[in-house]
């Protein structure tokens, strides 16, 4: 009980900054303050925090049924595995205020698939509660104002507009409020959002906008702050590698070029231990040789294949890199020059190929999963086996 009182006192202190969403809730004063803060987190796409606060509101007032409504809103409406419908079915609608019941009715429509009457219900509750921040926000996607719907909401409900300003920031970044992206205005909108609500999502948004602008250092710095908000299993963790790799792209490309050279040297020298540094057990290296025979999986057994080639030289050059948008995969294209002789002959054969390789980022570093070689220019590939 002591811990509960401390918890309640902590959340109650949030009332100084919480944005009031519901005017006629049946929750008691303390739960009402916590609930409003929970809705602010939900509006700002911080569902995990919102659910935690909703549970806290329910702990302080068992009759605060709107807390269960928020938990249902945060759940998925997927018909196969989502739990929103089950959670809604368990709600005692007799304990909901009229505004809360309107929210409930709209959520029920989201569980009906193609048979829903969401638009009809939306029109009805908007007419009934034109001055409710909650009702106007949860129905905002039905507006025909496009991106201006967020500005309209911010003007009408300035105290509840943290999430709206976050969306306005994207509108400026996408160029929806003019002829071109306006990053300065986008950052100002994020600043307004953060002034009202200091949650992590606005930091994540600032990072995304910085990345759109090409400022990956700024993106990385803000993403780290978003993760720091609650670091374990943070939903913002996944973007950190993307921003970090962009910041360090030149070094990364240099290291990948060297890795490609090293793995090829390991193959030519039949150094299995060195080769294993550059491949992963989770995905086999699939290779296509310059003799244009079938693709095959390059495994440890490949080192035992007989070869009648004796290399005089083998050099890789002119690397180019094509990264996936999230920087977790890269295609290397390059050229190889050299010469070799075949057993029983002193004739030197000019070798010239163009090649590509695919590398993926793993928990154990970058690993190669595919290579392809083909004759290029006036030279030859390796002979057929």
Descriptions of predicted regions:
Residues 30, 63-66, 98, 130-135, ...:
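Residue-level recognition of tetratricopeptide repeat
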Residues 44, 78, 112-113, 175-180, ...:
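Structural motif corresponding to the intra-repeat A-B loop/turn of tetratricopeptide repeats
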Residues 27-56, 60, 101-114, 138:
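Alpha-helical segment of the N-proximal tetratricopeptide repeat
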